[in-house]
């Protein structure tokens, strides 16, 4: 059987066991595969078990199922997984279906038995650590979940927050421009209400701080993704982050860097929604704006406390999948390459590698097993190649992860950027011309390479030579991304079969 170069490289690189209590600095070097536990893999290994997203029901994914498919994840070069919340949920099938996603918790001290047992979760953590990989777990501090109207909640079902005293008075958020409403009123509606915990109260705050430290310790968790961060007052978060003792990345669902970036002053990182919107718009069609993306890269770099600790993504369970906008595989390859080679921590959502095309929730929560987990799909291979060069650059250049991505070129259809210390930099050239894009040579200045230097384009495994003027002649065709790295630096790496 022929084994791809990137497979040999990736398995060779990921051998070091993670340190206890993974720090923000440790997480800079990671690449995250995000999955909904219920939708990724089943214990029985089925690739045909029905999962109708419109039903919004449990489909049978488990922690053991994830363990059994870690080869598939690691084969793409990912060094970490992020799984959805593990706490026990409301048990009813509501008008909106089951709490299969994990965001309608009722008992924070019990696990969701649909996913498995405590031993299963510990086994998942151990299996990851044996591979040198990290475990990130999703957590919710803002709210609980109740099957019914907010005005008639039976608070006794919540553990440990078993009385109304722990919660803000019921009111639904009407105006998202009013931060007081955003923090004090409730998400959800009167069909499934999300009772909003009053995190200004010491009894609530202390309970959460004790709980999160225990969760991390009990299951050897390396990092946390925190849901609905903007719905909790900022002064709650530093203590929570400290109590967790690991890297925390928060969901602040807002594309304005002036709103989102300051949350990095109260926790380690946030999901990079400011980049998400211009990134999506640049590549979801062949007429997208490269100007907006170019400008936002620079804005985030200058305005966020540390852009190298943000999470870069274009898909998740809350937003429509990229392929719901366009089925052009070349555009999908470009956006995936950007995610992996931009500043910060790359996040790819399960199914993105198989070009899943679900739109809004619940359509974007497809079962990964129905793809059959092929490892020869176009995007699987592209993601593996991009992760491979990123992982390799990190291993060879101590400054790679803290070097801030520098856009060096743009035109109506192209953006180029460099990241990494002089002599070891990766230069990425992205196009939104799409699969029908023409063939031409881009003369690229500002890459920082030396005249006559040979570069390897690691996606297609071709080489180019830097011109006498220092410009790089980059062959472009079919709208595909190009990723350049000094050929001499690849010796012994197995990347593009370098010996």
From Swiss-Prot:
Q: Which residues form a coiled coil?
A: none
Catalytic activity as recorded in UniProt: Endohydrolysis of (1->4)-alpha-D-glucosidic linkages in polysaccharides containing three or more (1->4)-alpha-linked D-glucose units
Q: Which keywords accompany this UniProt record?
A: Calcium, Carbohydrate metabolism, Disulfide bond, Glycoprotein, Glycosidase, Hydrolase, Metal-binding, Secreted, Signal
Q: Where is this site: Transition state stabilizer?
A: 318
Give the residues the record marks as binding Ca(2+) 2.
227, 251
Carbohydrate-modified residues: 218
Is Nucleotide-binding among the key words of this record?
no
- Matches recorded under Pfam families: A_amylase_dom_C (PF09260), Alpha-amylase (PF00128)
EC assignment: the record states 3.2.1.1
What are the GO MF terms of this UniProt record?
alpha-amylase activity; calcium ion binding
Give the cofactor binding note.
Binds 2 calcium ions per subunit. Calcium is inhibitory at high concentrations.
Biological process terms from the Gene Ontology for this record are:
carbohydrate catabolic process
Question: What cofactors are annotated for this protein?
Answer: Ca(2+)
Q: What is its main location?
A: secreted
Name which cysteines form disulfide bonds. 51-59, 171-185, 261-304, 461-496
Q: Which residues bind substrate?
A: 104, 143, 225, 230-231, 255, 365
Compartments annotated for it: namely: Secreted
What SMART domains does its record include?
Aamy (SM00642)
UniProt-annotated binding residues for Ca(2+) 1: 142, 183, 196, 231
Q: Where is the active site?
A: 227 (nucleophile), 251 (proton donor)
- Example of a GO cellular component annotation carried by this entry: extracellular region
Transmembrane portions of the chain: none
The protein's assembly and partners = Monomer.
Q: What protein family does this chain belong to?
A: Belongs to the glycosyl hydrolase 13 family.
For this entry, the protein name equals Alpha-amylase A type-3
Q: Which gene encodes it?
A: amy3
């Amino acid at each position: 059987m022929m084994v791809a170069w990137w497979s040999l490289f990736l398995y060779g690189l990921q051998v070091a066991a993670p340190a206890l209590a993974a720090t923000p600095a440790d997480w800079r070097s990671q690449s995250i595969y995000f999955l909904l536990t219920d939708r990724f893999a089943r214990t029985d290994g089925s690739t045909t078990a029905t999962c109708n997203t419109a039903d919004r029901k449990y489909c049978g994914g488990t922690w053991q199922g994830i363990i059994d498919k870690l080869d598939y994840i690691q084969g793409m070069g990912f060094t970490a997984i992020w799984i959805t919340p593990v706490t026990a949920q409301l048990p009813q099938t509501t008008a909106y279906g089951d709490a299969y996603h994990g965001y309608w918790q009722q008992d924070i001290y019990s696990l969701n038995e649909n996913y498995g047992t405590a031993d299963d979760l510990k086994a998942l953590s151990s299996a990851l650590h044996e591979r040198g990989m990290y475990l990130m777990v999703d957590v919710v501090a803002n709210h609980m979940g109740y099957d019914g109207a907010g005005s008639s909640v039976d608070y006794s079902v919540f553990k440990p927050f078993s009385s109304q005293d722990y919660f803000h008075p019921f009111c639904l958020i009407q105006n998202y421009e009013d931060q007081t409403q955003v923090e004090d009123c409730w998400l959800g509606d009167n069909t499934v209400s999300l009772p909003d915990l009053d995190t200004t109260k010491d009894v609530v705050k202390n309970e959460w701080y004790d709980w999160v430290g225990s969760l991390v310790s009990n299951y050897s968790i390396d990092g946390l993704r925190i849901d609905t961060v903007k719905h909790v007052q900022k002064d709650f978060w530093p203590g929570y982050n400290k109590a967790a003792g690991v890297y925390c990345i928060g969901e602040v669902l807002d594309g304005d860097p002036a709103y989102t970036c300051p949350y990095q002053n109260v926790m380690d990182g946030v999901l990079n929604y400011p980049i998400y919107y211009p990134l999506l718009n640049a590549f979801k069609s062949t007429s997208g704006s490269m100007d907006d993306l170019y400008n936002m890269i620079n804005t985030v770099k200058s305005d966020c406390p540390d852009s190298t600790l943000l999470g870069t993504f274009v898909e998740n369970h809350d937003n429509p999948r990229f392929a719901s906008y366009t089925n052009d595989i070349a555009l999908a390859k470009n956006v995936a390459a950007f995610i992996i080679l931009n500043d910060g921590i790359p996040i790819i959502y399960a199914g993105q590698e198989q070009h899943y095309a679900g739109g809004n929730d619940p359509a974007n929560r497809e079962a990964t097993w129905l793809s059959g987990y092929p490892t020869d799909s176009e995007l699987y291979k592209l993601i593996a190649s991009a992760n491979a060069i990123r992982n390799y650059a990190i291993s060879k250049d101590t400054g790679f992860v803290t070097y801030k991505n520098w856009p060096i070129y743009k035109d109506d259809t192209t953006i180029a950027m460099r990241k990494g210390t002089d002599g070891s930099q990766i230069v990425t050239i992205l196009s939104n011309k799409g699969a029908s894009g023409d063939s031409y040579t881009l003369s690229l200045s500002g890459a920082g390479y030396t005249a006559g230097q040979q570069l390897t384009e690691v996606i297609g495994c071709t080489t180019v030579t830097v011109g006498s003027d220092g410009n790089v002649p980059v062959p472009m065709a079919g709208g595909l991304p190009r990723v350049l790295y000094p050929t001499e630096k690849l010796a012994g790496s197995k990347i593009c079969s370098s010996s």
